[in-house]
Amino acid sequence: MIPGMGMNPKQLKQMQRAMKQMGMDMKDLRGVEEVVIKLKRKEIIIKNPKVNVMEFMGQKTYQVTGKARERSLEAEMEIPEDDIELVMNQTGASREDATRALQETGGDLAEAIMRLS
């Protein structure tokens, strides 16, 4: 449940006071332009998000709301031509297979060669 949703201002103030008495503090984080969540193979990007910070028992919890979009990191990885040729020469693999192996291994030459051998 998002605090304050569907409440009138008086109810919201009462709820905030009750939270404060229980040791909970909730504030809006202002000026946030973008939130990026980095995963192994992609990023989740939220532009112009609304961010709330709730502190309870010394722990901070961030609540982020907004329109999210995903961006694949594998597709953006630029593999140097020399690396592709080295993998091709070492394994006899096609350009396509060598490139795919390098992308899947994050550009790790040894790992790409081992996968194709």
UniProtKB/Swiss-Prot annotation:
Pfam families: NAC, UBA_HYPK. Disulfide bonds: none annotated. The keyword Transferase does not apply. Residues 9-77 form the NAC-A/B domain. Transmembrane segments: none annotated. Keywords: Protein transport, RNA-binding, Transport. InterPro entries: NAC-like_UBA, NAC_A/B_dom_sf, NAC_arc, Nas_poly-pep-assoc_cplx_dom, UBA-like_sf. Gene3D superfamilies: DNA helicase RuvA subunit, C-terminal domain (1.10.8.10), Nascent polypeptide-associated complex domain (2.20.70.30). SMART domains: NAC (SM01407). One of its GO terms (biological process) is protein transport. GO terms for molecular function: RNA binding. The keyword Hydrolase does not apply. CDD domains: NAC_NACA (cd22054), UBA_AeNAC (cd14359). Belongs to the NAC-alpha family. HAMAP family: NAC_arch (MF_00814). Homodimer. Interacts with the ribosome. Binds ribosomal RNA. Contacts the emerging nascent chain on the ribosome. This is Nascent polypeptide-associated complex protein. The gene is nac.
